[in-house]
Amino acid sequence: MALSSLVEFVILVVKNPCYQQDDASSSIQEISISASEIASWDMSEILSYGSVKVRAHRTRLIQESSYFHGLLSGSFSESGLDHISVEWNLESFLNLLMCLYGYDIEITSSSFLPLFESALYFGVEKLLSICKNWLSVLASSNDNALPKVELSDLIQIWSFGLEHAGEFVPDLCVAYLAKNFMLVKSDKYFGNVPYELLMWCVKHPHLTVHSEMDLVDGLLIWLDAGGRLSDLPESSQDNTINLMEQVRFSLLPLWFIAGRSKSHGFSKFADQSIELVTKLMKMPSTCLVDSLTDGPPTDVRVRLTEYSEILDLSGCPQLNEASLLLSILPNSYFANLRWRKSLESFLKNPDDDERHQEQISHRTLPILSFESVKEIDISKCQRLDYKVVIKCFSKSFPSLRKLRAAYLLNIKVSTLLELLLNFRELTEVDLTVDVSPIIPVQASVFYSGQGHCLLSSITRLTLEGRSDICDMELRSISRVCESLCYLNIKGCALLSDACIASVIQRCKKLCSLIVCYTSFSENSILALCATISMTNEHMDINSVASNLQTLHMSKCEGISETSLLNLITHSQKMKSLCLRDTKVSDSVLCEFPGSTLEALDISNTTISWMALARVISRNPNLKTLKARGCKNLLQLEVDGRTDNFSPLVSGQEVFKCLSKGSGLEELEIGWGFSYFSFESLRPAASFLRVISVGLGASLGEDVLKLLPSTCPLLESIVLHFQEISDSALTSVLTSLKHLQELALSYCFGEISLQSFKFSMPNLRKLRLERVTRWMTNDDLLVLTQSCPNLTELSLVGCLHLTSDCQPIISAGWPGMISLHLEECGSITENGVASLYGCIALEDLFLRHNGSGIQKSFLLDATLKFPMLRLVSLDMCDAKEGGFDVPEEKEEGRSLSIVKISRCKSDRCSLGRRAAPMHRETLVMLWNGQTLTKTLLKQRL
C-alpha cells in the first residue's frame, strides 16, 4: 500500500524565489499541504511561508501539464523521484494547481501576466484557455461592468506576449487599448505606451473616440511625455509624423486646429488642416462625393465602432450630410462601382415623399446600426441638412438618448417635432442659441420690423435663446413631451405668460424650470402652485412648485409680492433658486421653507443680511451664493424693524453661517463684503472654485494675498472696482495653478507688466478693462507668451495699442474664440485684415479703436470667420460711414446677432471732437427664419 501511494502521489517543493525571510518571524518557513484538500486551503496563511510542500496526484500532473508530462513520464532522472523542486511565484503556482484540479480561479489585471506566464511555462492548456478567454472578453465586450486592465499591466502583457506568446496576446492588447482609448489617454502611464503598441492601436478598426480631436489630444499627450518632442532624432521624427498622419484632419473643429497650431507635434499639420477644412466648407455634398476616389473614403468618415457611446461633432462647420452618410455605410458598399450614383441620388432627393424616400434608402443605402451610441453633439454644424440627418440618425442610432444641436439657426420647431417622432428613446434635447439682447419689456424701441401624435420620452428640453418659438409651437411641443422634468426656455421672448402656464399645467413632472428673460409671471405662478389632480380616482395634494428642485427666473417682471410669496412658500424641495433682477423682498425670502438649497442667486435685489442669514442658516449644504448688486447688504437693520431671528445681522454672522456648512464652491458678492467678511468665510472657502467681487465690496490687497492659501482650488477670479497691486496679483498668478479665468474691471491701484510675466498655460479667459492703460504692442507680445492658450480676451482702455498688435493677437492666439477690444488706441485705424488669422472667432466686439474698418467688413467676416455668431461694431470706426449687411437668406450662416452703435457727434467749444457719447444701437437678429432690425436707445 505504501509503495502504491508513492507511485500515485508526488511531493512538489515550491520555493518562492522572491521570498525574503523576516528575522523576527518564526524559524519554520515551510508548510505542507495537499492538493486533495484545495477547498480548505487558507491562501493568506500559505503565502506567508517561503516554501510549500504540495502533495499532488502524479497522474493529474502528467495529464494536465506538458511540463510535468515530460518530467514525470519521460526519461528524465526526476521521473522516478517522489519529491520535485519547483522555483516559482508561490501564488501563481498554487492558482495553477487549483486550475489543474478543476477549481475556479480569479483573474485580475495584476494577476493575468503571472498566471499566463505560469500556464505557458508549465504547459497547462486549460489555464492558457482561461487566460485567453478572459482577455478576449475584456477586449471585445460592451459590458461596462467588467473589470478594467490597468494600463501599466497592459503594457507588460503586450511586451511579454510579443516576445513569448505569438500574435493573439498582442492583438488582444491592441484591441483593448483601441476600444478604451478615451479611458487610457488620461492615465498617468499613457506616456509609457511603446510606439509600436500605440501605432497599432491608432490603426485598429475598433479605435473608439468621442471625436477626432480626442485622438489628437491623446497623441499630443503621448508625444509630450518624457520629452519626446525635444531634440528628436530623425527616426523619432518619422515616428511622430507617422502617428499624426493617422489623424483625419478633415474632422477636426476649427477652434481646435487653430488652438493647437503652436503645438510641436501638430504645428506641421495645422496650416494644411485649416486649408482642408476651409475647402470642405465651400464644397456641397454632391461635390464631396464626386471628389472621392474608389474604395472606402477613410479620411472623411467619422470614427464609429460597435463600442461608440458618444459622438461629438460640435464645432465642425465643414461637415455636411455626405460626411455623415459615408460614416454609417459599410465598407462593402464602396466595392460597388456605382456607389457614388446611389449616394448622390439620395442626397439630391431629400424632399421626396416619405414612401419613395424609404424605398431609395433601403434599396441603395445599407445603413449600419450603432446601438451603443447614446449621445450625439452636432452643435455649430450649420451646413447639415437636417431632413437627411434625422432619417439617417434614426436608422443608425436607435438607442439615442441625448442630442445637443446648439447654435443651429436652421433647426425649426417642425424639425424638433420630427426628432421626437423618429427617436423614441430620446430623453434630452438641447437646441440653445444666443439669447437676444433685446428684452421687449425693457427696450425703448424706435421702430421694429419682421417676421395629435404619440407621446415622446423626452425628459430634458433646452430651447434657450430660441426667439423664433411662439406660443402655438411650444404648446405643440408640450403635447408630445408630457414627461418633461427639465425645461429651459431662457430668452424665448415671444412666449406669453399664458402659454408658459399652459405648458406647466400639462407637464406635471417638471422639477427644473429655467424661464429667465421671458414673460413668466402671475399665470405661470398660479399653474405652478395649483394642486395636481390625477385621473385614477387619486388626488395628489402636491403642486408642481412643491416638487421643483431648480427655478431660475432672472429678470421676470410684473410679478406681485403676493404671487412671489405663494411660489416661495410652496418650494420646499428647491436646490437651485435664481431670483436675480426680480422684486423679491426680505419678507418673501424669509418664508422660504426649504433646507436642501445648494445654489442661491439674489443679485440686484433688495435683500438684506437678515433675510440672507435666515436662508443660509436653514440650508447648510449651500455651495453657490450670488449676491452682487444688493445694496441693502450694507444695512444692519431694515426699515427700522426688528425680527425674531435677529434685530441686527452683520455680514460676518452670515458668513459664519456659511462656514458651518459643507463648503462654498462659488461666490459672487458686492456691497458689504470686506476683509472681516472674508475672515469669517475662510473656514468655508477651502473648496471655492469661483469668486466674483463687485461694486460695494472692499477686499484690499491683504485679501488678494490670502486667496492662494485660503482657496487653493480657485479656477476663476473676477474683480470689479477693487484695489489691486503688482505684489497681490503676482501672488495670485504664481500660486493658483488651476486658474482658468482672470477678470479685472475698473480696478484701482498700480499694476504693471511684471504681474503678467509668469507662465500661465492654464489661463483661458482674460479680461483687463480700464486697468492696463499703459499696455503697448510689446507688452501684448509678452502676454501672448505668458498666456499661450487664451481663448477669450477683453481689453478696454489700452490707449497705446496700434494696428501692429493685430498680427500679434492672430499669431499669439490663433485659437481665439471671443475677442473684445474697446477704446484701445488705433488698433483698427488701418482696417482689421490682420485679425483674420483668428479663424475660429465666434464673438467679436470692436468699438472706438480707430476709424478704418471697411464698409464690407460684415460680409467679409462671415467668410473669414466661419464660426462667427456675435458681432458688435460702432459707426465711429467705420471708414466709409457705415457697414453693408449680409443677405437675409444666406445658407449655412452662423452669424445670428449684429449690434451697431452710433454716437452723438458733439464738438467742444474749441472745435475739437468731444469724447463720444452713445446715441443709439441697431440690433439685427437672425433667428433662422427672419431678420429683425431694432433700433434701441440703450447701449448694449
From Swiss-Prot:
Transmembrane region(s): none
Gene Ontology BP, a term: protein ubiquitination
UniProtKB keywords: Ubl conjugation pathway
The organism of origin for this protein: Arabidopsis thaliana (Mouse-ear cress)
Hydrolase among keywords: no
Functional note: May act as a substrate-specific adapter of an E3 ubiquitin-protein ligase complex (CUL3-RBX1-BTB) which mediates the ubiquitination and subsequent proteasomal degradation of target proteins.
Pathway assignment: Protein modification; protein ubiquitination
Keyword Plastid belongs to the record: no
BACK domain sequence ranges: 155-258
Domain of life of the native organism: Eukaryota
Annotated ranges, domain BTB: 41-109
Comment field on protein domains: The BTB/POZ domain mediates the interaction with some component of ubiquitin ligase complexes.
Entry-linked PROSITE patterns: BTB
One Pfam family of this chain: BACK
Name of protein: BTB/POZ domain-containing protein FBL11
Annotated PANTHER family: PARTNER OF PAIRED, ISOFORM B-RELATED
InterPro entries: BACK (IPR011705), BTB/POZ_dom (IPR000210), Leu-rich_rpt_Cys-con_subtyp (IPR006553), LRR_dom_sf (IPR032675), SKP1/BTB/POZ_sf (IPR011333)
